[in-house]
Amino acid sequence: MGKTPLLREDGRCQRNTFGGSKASSKGSSSSSSNNTVSSKKKPRRKADALMFIQIFIHLLKSNIGTGFLGLPLAVKNAGLLVGPVSLLAIGALTVHCMDILLNCACHLTSRLQRSFVNYEETTMYSLETCPSPWLRTHSVWGRYVVSFLLIVTQLGFCSVYFMFMADNLQQIVEEAHFTSNVCQPRQSLVMTSILDTRFYMLTILPFLILLVLVQNPQVLSIFSTLATITTLSSLALIFEYLIQIPHHSHLPLVASWKTFLLFFGTAIFTFEGVGMVLPLKSQMKSPQQFPAVLYLGMSFVIFLYICLGTLGYMKFGADTQASITLNLPNCWLYQSVKLMYSVGIFFTYALQFHVPAEIIVPYVVSRASENWALFIDLTVRAALVCLTCFSAVLIPRLDLVISLVGSVSSSALALIIPPLLEIATFYSENISCTTIAKDIMISILGLLGCVLGTYQALYEMTQQSRFPMLNSTNVHT
C-alpha cells in the first residue's frame, strides 16, 4: 500500500513520500466538520472534535452494514475459493485507494494552504494542476461528478437499508405464530405474505425522517455507538450459529463468470465507508492518528468480511439468501438477532445520510432567504429520506440493488477515481512510472467491474420483471 503522509503533532502534513513528491508543511491545523460543496470552510471547534475511539466506531459502522450480511450470497456467486480470495484482493485495493485519497487531500491542503478539502474539492484541485489544458479549464466538472456519485452511492446505501429493515421486520412479524423456543435449522415453506414488504418500508419512513433531523456530530456518535453495540451483539450470535452445525460439502470452488460480476458489485458495495474517510478525518481531535484508525479498522473489517462470507456460504449452500439473517432459525433467539441488527442499521442510516445531506442541503439553503433557512433545511432532509424510500419501493430486490449500486457508483468512488487523482496531483512533481502504471491498472480494473457488473445487475432486473416473484415470503420451521 502507498505511504500515508506523515503528520505533525498538530495534524498538519509534514512530508509526502508518495510517488517521489514532497509536500510543504504549511497549512492550518483546524479542519471542517462538514463535507459540503462550498469552498469556504469553518474552523472545527474543539468541543465538536471526536476522539480516536469515536472515529473508530464511525469507521466500523460505515463499513459494516447491509452489504456485509449479503457477503455469503456474494461468495456463492464467486465460488468457495474465488470468493474469499477476491474479497481480500478487493479489500486491499479499496484501502489502498482510501490511502491515496487521503494522501492527495493532505498534499493539496499544504499546497493551497487550506484547512481542509473534501473528496469533491480534492478532485477539482487535482485537475487544476494536471498537465492537460482542457482538464484544467473544466476542473469544476470533476467536483460535480464526484458530488453526484457520492449522492447516488450514499442514497443507494440508504435505499438498501430500507429494504433490509423491511424484509427482516416482515419476517419477524409474519413468522411470529411459527416462532418457537427451540432453534432448529430452517426448512423452507413458502406462504403468502400478510402484508407487502412495501408496507413495512412506509411504516419505517416517519421514524427515519425524525432521525435524520439530528445533525450534531456528538449525538451522531452516540447513535453510532448504539448501532455498534446492537450490531456486534447480533454478529456474535450469527457467528456462533454458523460454526456450531456441520457445513455443506462439495460446494463449487469457482462459480460462473456471470454471477461473479454480481459478486463484484456486492463486494465493492460492502466497503461503504469510502465517502466518509475525509469527513471523519476532519472531525478527529488528533488527525495525525487517523491513518492508524484507518488501517486498524479496515483490517478488522476485511477479516470479518471473509469470515462471514465463507462461513455463511458453507453453512447454507445453495439456499443462501440475499441477507444471511433471512436464513437464521425461526426461534426467539435469532428473531431477536434480526431485530437487533435492524436497530443497528436504523441508526447507521443517519451516518450514511450525512454525506449527501451535507452536499445537497447547504446548496439549496443558500438560495433561500435567511428566514426560511431552517424550514428548507428540514424539508430537504425529509424529502431525501422519502426519495430513498421511494427507490426501495420501486425495486424491492435487496441483492440486485446492492450489486447495481456497488457496480455503478461505489466502484467509481473507491477504485476508479482515487488512482487518477494521484496521477493528476503528483504528475508535475516527478511521480514514478511504476506508480502511474499501478494507478492505471487499478482504474481499468474498476472500470471493467463497473461496466460489466452494471450490465449483469440490470439484466437480472429485467429477467426479474419478466418473471416476477409471487408476493410471498419464506417461512421456515
Swiss-Prot record:
Matching InterPro entries: AA_transpt_TM (IPR013057)
Renumbered residue ranges of the record's region Disordered: 1-42
Ranges facing Cytoplasmic side: 1-54, 99-144, 224-225, 281-291, 366-374, 421-439
Highest taxon of source: Eukaryota
Compartments, record wording: Membrane
Ranges annotated as spanning the membrane: 55-75, 78-98, 145-165, 203-223, 226-246, 260-280, 292-312, 345-365, 375-395, 400-420, 440-460
Any one GO biological process: L-alanine transport
Family of the protein in this entry: Belongs to the amino acid/polyamine transporter 2 family.
This protein's name: Proton-coupled amino acid transporter 3
Species assigned in the record: Rattus norvegicus (Rat)
